[in-house]
């Protein structure tokens, strides 16, 4: 284990003798299946679960010669923004003492920031790669939905989540994306990206001369003053390298957080129904009837945040409320996607602070879930729109806290955001 509690399991998995990742260590988030090595999702419910197969991305890592040093800590079932809801203890931030590392892939970002792994895989449902990358001062890519296989990812919200890379540099993240991207017969949502020149890593050339950047004003409104100041400094840096920027409007993002949480919680209530102590998960005992056994397993196995989201999701899907909540959330999702598509007609990429706040103090948001949800305001819209995004270090506040800059591209426009991001990191 690391001093930052970045790993849940530090069991080494060896890859092939050679390949593009030979000699490199790639940590894997603990909701991604690894054959013969336990995969807990940060939950007591799956404390002893050992998958009988590898996720597709794990197979691709091994084939590429990577060594997996362990499974990284995470918010339970990916539900959190701080990596404090794990049943295996909170993760500390190597880049900001006493602050959270972000979530839910906080362990992956922390081990990369601390130098305990060269690279890492996370998963991003509403910002779970980009948030910890921003808070830990590293790079994280949320790929276009369908670019990377989700086979072997223990699902939280199927229509939103993607597996992606975390690295110290944009080039390193792009090299990892080159390995894991591509169609998979085991995941019908994957698709072939349109043909393009060169690898993702080759796009990390730092050339932003002539790049047009749209800045959505709505994603700056209400952001912390120090974050906004650091963001504009980074934008000035890009401008000095030949890029230009202008304001764009995304009026729909005002409703993105609530739409995201209705959809994500609804999908979670369905996905997590399988963890009942009989099909999957720790047993609730065999005293009493089946309902009591199921209830005991879920009461003991799930943490408070997971229970909250399951209950809210079940409510949103219940008879009489489906049209009131879930259908309206899906309508808002379509509006968000339309707004992004229109904004990207007038810009090559969009830019905003990754997170509207710097890393919070540990323990600060645990008793205030609404504050934690609202911190996702800049990242969740991208998942609703199924677009690619990257978080790169923009600098630090006067207090020395890391700030991330998010770049969003059109569908399968990973090379555009990688090229833009590599001018900064």
From Swiss-Prot:
BP GO annotations: translation
Record keywords: ATP-binding, Ligase, Nucleotide-binding, Protein biosynthesis
Top-level taxon of the source organism: Archaea
Annotated active site: 29 (charge relay system), 104 (charge relay system), 128 (acyl-ester intermediate)
Record-linked InterPro entries: Amidase, Amidase_CS, Amidase_dom, AS_sf, GatA
Catalytic activity from the UniProt record: L-glutamyl-tRNA(Gln) + L-glutamine + ATP + H2O = L-glutaminyl-tRNA(Gln) + L-glutamate + ADP + phosphate + H(+)
Enzyme Commission no: 6.3.5.7
Molecular function, one GO term: ATP binding
HAMAP family xref list: GatA
Function as written in the Swiss-Prot or TrEMBL entry: Allows the formation of correctly charged Gln-tRNA(Gln) through the transamidation of misacylated Glu-tRNA(Gln) in organisms which lack glutaminyl-tRNA synthetase. The reaction takes place in the presence of glutamine and ATP through an activated gamma-phospho-Glu-tRNA(Gln).
Family statement: Belongs to the amidase family. GatA subfamily.
Subunit structure: Heterotrimer of A, B and C subunits.
Protein name: Glutamyl-tRNA(Gln) amidotransferase subunit A
Gene symbol of the encoding locus: gatA
């Amino acid at each position: 284990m690391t001093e930052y509690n970045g790993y849940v399991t530090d069991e080494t998995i060896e890859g092939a003798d050679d390949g593009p990742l030979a000699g490199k260590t790639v940590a894997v988030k603990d909701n991604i299946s690894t054959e013969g090595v336990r995969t807990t999702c940060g939950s007591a419910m799956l404390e002893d679960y050992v998958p009988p197969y590898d996720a597709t991305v794990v197979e691709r890592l091994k084939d590429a010669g990577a060594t997996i040093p362990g499974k990284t800590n995470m918010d339970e079932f990916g539900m959190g923004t701080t990596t404090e809801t794990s049943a295996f203890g909170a993760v500390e931030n190597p880049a900001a003492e006493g602050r959270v590392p972000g979530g839910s892939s906080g362990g992956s970002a922390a081990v990369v920031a601390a130098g305990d792994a060269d690279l890492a895989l996370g998963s991003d449902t509403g910002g779970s790669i980009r948030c910890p990358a921003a808070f830990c001062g590293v790079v994280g890519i949320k790929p276009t939905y369908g670019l990377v296989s989700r086979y072997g990812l223990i699902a939280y919200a199927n229509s939103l989540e993607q597996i992606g890379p975390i690295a110290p540099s944009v080039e390193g993240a792009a090299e990892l994306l080159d390995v894991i991207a591509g169609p998979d017969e085991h995941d019908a949502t994957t698709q072939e990206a349109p043909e393009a020149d060169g690898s993702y890593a080759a796009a990390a050339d730092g050339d932003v001369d002539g790049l047009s950047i749209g800045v959505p004003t709505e994603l700056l409104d209400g952001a912390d003053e120090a974050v906004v100041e650091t963001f504009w400094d980074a934008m000035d840096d890009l401008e000095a390298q030949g890029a230009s920027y202008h304001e764009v409007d995304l009026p729909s993002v005002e409703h993105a957080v609530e739409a995201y949480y209705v959809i994500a919680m609804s999908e979670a209530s369905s996905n997590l129904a399988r963890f009942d102590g009989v099909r999957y998960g720790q047993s609730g005992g065999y005293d009493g009837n089946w309902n009591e056994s199921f209830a005991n397993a879920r009461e003991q196995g799930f943490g408070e945040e997971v229970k909250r989201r399951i209950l809210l999701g079940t409510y949103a899907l219940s008879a009489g409320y489906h049209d009131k909540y879930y259908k309206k959330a899906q309508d808002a999702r379509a509006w968000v996607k339309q707004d992004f598509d229109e904004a990207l007609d007038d810009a090559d990429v969009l830019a905003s602070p990754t997170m509207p706040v710097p890393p919070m103090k540990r323990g600060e948001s645990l008793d205030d879930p609404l504050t934690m949800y609202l911190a996702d305001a800049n990242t969740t819209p991208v998942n609703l729109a199924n677009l690619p995004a990257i978080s790169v270090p923009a600098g630090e506040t006067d207090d020395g806290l890391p700030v991330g800059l998010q770049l969003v591209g059109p569908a399968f426009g990973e090379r555009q955001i990688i090229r833009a991001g590599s001018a900064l990191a």
